[in-house]
Amino acid sequence: MLYLIGLGLSYESDITVRGLETIKKCKRVYLEAYTSILMAANQESLEAFYGREIILADRELVEGGSDKILENADEDDVAFLVVGDPFGATTHTDLIIRARELNIKVEAIHNASVMNAVGACGLQLYQFGQTVSLVFFTETWKPDSFYNKIMENRRIGLHTLLLLDIKVKEQSIENMARGKLIYEPPRYMNIETAASQLLEIEEMRQEKAYTPNTPCVAISRLGSPEQTFKAGTLQELSEYDSGEPLHSLVMLGRQVHDLELEYLYEYVDNKEQFKKFVEEDQEFFKPPPYVPPEDENLSE
C-alpha cells in the first residue's frame, strides 16, 4: 500500500493522529522535499517525533525515479509525506497514477494546506477563483499564462490566490550544460518580487486585468508562529519587506464583502485610503446594467 500523508503547514505535530499511526507501521517513509517546506520543523525533528528514519525525495527521485519509491509497495506499506495536503501539487497525482498502473493500492490522509488555510487572512474561501502559480522570471523567460486566469477571476468578481515559486535543489543552465551535478542555493519568492513581476506583466500586456492600485493581501509564513498578513495595493507591496519564507499573495476580486473588508482593515496602513482603492477597483469588470428586451407585442 502507498500512503500519501499530509503534514500540515508548520510543526511536526501538525500531522493527524491517523497519519502518525500510519507512518509508524510503514516499512519506508519518504518526505517530498521540493514543492514546499515545513516552517517550524526539519528532517531531524520529524524523525525524532515519528520515531522513524525518513528518506528525502527530491524532484529527480519523484519525477524520474518513482519506481524506487513504489518498489515492493504491492506487498509493503510505504509512506510518502507531503507538506500541506497530498493533492496540493500535480506531481503527487502523477505518483498515484503510476502506482495504479502497477496495481498498488493507494490511500490519502489529508491535512491543512495553503488552499484552505488562506481563509485566515479574512477573505471567504467560496469567493476564490482559480489558483495560479508565479515563477521566478529570468532575462529571457517571463511566462504570463497566469495573467489570463487572473483576468477570468476578476471578470466574475472572485479573489485570486497566487502561489509563489520555490527553487530547491535546482541546477544552473551552465552546470547542466557541463554535466556538473552542482545545485544552486534554495530560493523562495518573496512578496516584493511577486508584486513587481505582476506589475511588469501588466505593463507589457496593457489589458488592465489589474492596476498598480489593485488591492491585495500578502500572506507570510502561514500556519507558523510568525504568521503575518499585510493588505495594500500591488504598488505598495512591491516595496514591502515580507521577511522569511514562505509567502503567498491574494489579489482581491471585484466582489469584496463588507465583513471581508472590515477584517482586512487590521492589516492596512491607512484604512480610508485602502477602502478608496477597493471601491475604485470594484468598478473594473463591473457588468453593465440589465436592460430588458423590448416586448414585441407591446410595440405593435
From Swiss-Prot:
E.C. numbers: 2.1.1.314
Catalytic activity, as annotated: 2-[(3S)-amino-3-carboxypropyl]-L-histidyl-[translation elongation factor 2] + 4 S-adenosyl-L-methionine = diphthine methyl ester-[translation elongation factor 2] + 4 S-adenosyl-L-homocysteine + 3 H(+)
Q: What class of enzyme is it?
A: transferase
Offer an example of a GO molecular function term for this protein.
Answer: diphthine methyl ester synthase activity
Task: Tell me where in or outside the cell this protein is found.
Answer: Cytoplasm
Coiled coil regions in record: none
Enumerate the UniProt keywords alphabetically.
Cytoplasm, Methyltransferase, S-adenosyl-L-methionine, Transferase
GO biological process terms, semicolon-separated = methylation; protein histidyl modification to diphthamide
Q: In which pathway does it act?
A: Protein modification; peptidyl-diphthamide biosynthesis
The record's Gene Ontology cellular component field reads: cytoplasm
The record's family statement is: Belongs to the diphthine synthase family.
Protein name stated in the entry? Diphthine methyl ester synthase
Q: Give the source species.
A: Debaryomyces hansenii (strain ATCC 36239 / CBS 767 / BCRC 21394 / JCM 1990 / NBRC 0083 / IGC 2968) (Yeast)
Q: What phylogenetic lineage does the species belong to?
A: Eukaryota, Fungi, Dikarya, Ascomycota, Saccharomycotina
